[in-house]
Amino acid sequence: MKQNIRKLNYKITKSFHGLTIEAFLHRKRYTRGMISGLKKVKYVENGVTHYGIEKNGQWAFSIDSLAEGDLLSISFLEMEAEDSAAPYSLPLDIVYEDEDILLLNKPAGIPSHPSPGHYEGTLAGAASYYYKEIKGIQPFVCRMIHRLDLDTSGLLLLGKNKFSGSLLNQDMRAGRIERCYTAFCHGNPALAFENTTSPSSVSKENAKNSGNLGIPDSLPTSLKILPGLEKTGSILRISAPIQRVENEYMLREVHFQNGQEAVTNILSVEYFPEKHFSRIKLRLETGRTHQIRVHLSYIGCPLLGDSLYGGSAYTPYMERQALHSSSIEFFHPENGEKMQFEIPLPRDMQELL
């Protein structure tokens, strides 16, 4: 078995002369936790002992100073496997892979990660199997940068090591990773935004029909739009906080007083009047559990096939919610290059047309 090591080399230029190693690494977006972990790294490769931090081939401390022309070598070493993702033999549809990134096309019906009732047969387990049994690398820790629901298909991004996992997670939290979805939903979502003038507009009657939304009783009764809806040009924005339904494990709901911030942008709507459904493209600003499903249900346009949130199956072709992670944009953790990927719809969603 090969050791799971990620080594990065930095040639120090004049602009970084005089900085400590720690200060330099902070400029490269290394966190304190990452730097602290490097101090514990020690391994043997080709008969030579190496360390997590080396300057000009010698063990170095993070407080040591750098000079122009120095070669700083950083090594991340996986110490132990993630026990919750047991290796599982399952074909992987790899869209892109390099030293830091694994981008997969997830099929519907496969869990992204272990959870109650789905401890085996997960994509995380399949990735562990791929690296251990096929690539001969051990241990492997599956670092999913985002997740997809069991019956959602499409692009899923993984960081292959501590370095890429940390930087991609930073980007995810900062909103620098753009994920777009293609979906089919009942009705025409654009109708919910007619006459929308502000994201606080609300109809108490609509609110009652949509469940307990946590909307204050003091709001005017004359307004006729659900809260959290805003139209800017062609973009339809849903800003409606989401929380877990009390005494429910899976079910989520919109709740304006107690929910967590959740924002979904509908970028385009193609309505098919003869079929009474729409094909829509969406972009997430946040990543709450079931966010798209909850938000579309909230505006009265649940996903086709999403029985959990009110969407009955439309045709025999759809045995799941009609939701597909179709494109992703992010910056490569090592060189900052902008990465863009887009994949077509799976067959079951194509057959809806």
Predicted stretch roles:
Residues 1-353:
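RNA pseudouridine synthases
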